[in-house]
């Protein structure tokens, strides 16, 4: 997507946005103000492998998959689309990982850095 606005309304559930300085995010490139990641690109993992940590607020079982609503603190809530049924309970630790190739990077104005560098 060209910008955060477009990224936010394409897809269901919508893309997650996390400020790069947020305590739950273990690392991010220096020139990025916010990352975007789609719920289907987040994977529940062990704490040792986690790139992101949160607490489960709610889980919605939908047959082939479950939607996990995760509190990262600081008024940031994200959604993860987990395969299969889940036995996770409210309040459970939610260490998550993702493929960095699936991240979308946005500058402070919400413009995709992939787009801004592609047009220079």
Which residues are covered by each model-predicted region?
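Conserved beta-strand-loop-alpha-helix hinge in the C-terminal portion
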Residues: 1-11
């Amino acid at each position: 997507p060209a910008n955060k606005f477009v990224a936010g309304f394409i897809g269901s559930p919508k893309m997650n946005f996390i400020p790069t300085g947020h305590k739950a995010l273990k690392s991010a490139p220096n020139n990025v103000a916010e990352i975007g990641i789609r719920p289907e690109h987040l994977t529940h993992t062990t704490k040792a492998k986690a790139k992101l940590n949160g607490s489960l607020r709610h889980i919605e079982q939908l047959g082939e998959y479950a939607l996990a609503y995760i509190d990262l603190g600081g008024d940031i809530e994200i959604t993860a689309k987990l395969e299969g049924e889940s036995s996770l309970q409210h309040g459970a630790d939610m260490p998550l990982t993702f493929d960095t190739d699936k991240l979308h990077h946005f500058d402070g104005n919400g413009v995709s850095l992939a787009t801004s560098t592609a047009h220079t």
